Amino acid sequence: SAAAEARRGARTKGNRESAMTVEQFVMAYGAEQNRLRALLPEGFASLRPVLRINAEVRDGKTGALEFNTAAEKADNRGWVNIGRWDDVPFTKDGKKTTFTLPELTISFTGVGIEGGCPAEKDNVGCYYLKDGTFTLVPAEKITANKEFCDCEFAWRFAGGAHGVSPGKTLPAIPEEETTHYEKAAFTVENAAVIPCTQVLGAYQVTFER
């Protein structure tokens, strides 16, 4: 009926008003897996030699960023969070979006080609440390089309990793354990100083949360 249609329209509109528009930018880069193994907290196993930076612009106003690595815990294959930042300053210049932190500068430039990330299928979610315990947050279901990006980044720690995307998406192939490194603290700085072997790929996607 017309009334039902109107109600449905009102409900949809109401939901839309409360939704947040998210521009999400994701970049993965290669890092020696033996060194990642030495950092991971108890109970986690490294899945691939990869570190990932996710950045977001929320409602065109607020920047946010997180730093993760591919890991498995209790048969859950996904990511574990190394660090998170809110209220991240960002700038836009045409198709280029740049996020700037005291620890990191990273920019994403859309190239107008649809694409995504090969590892997304193998992702139940991400573990975040809260009150001394790692809690799994299920992966968001994002159906919007993704656009490949060129990406450039540099960690600002002494000896921090840096890289520029090669214009193609590359897989992260698991590496055998060859060198055993001493256990190190699971910190942003310890992960950020592992050299970037290459930028594996980057994309951007806009959706409502």
Give the residues covered by each predicted segment:
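N-terminal domain-onset segments
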Residues: S1-A64, K183, A191-V193, T206-R209
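Interaction-surface and assembly-scaffold signal
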Residues: F90-R209
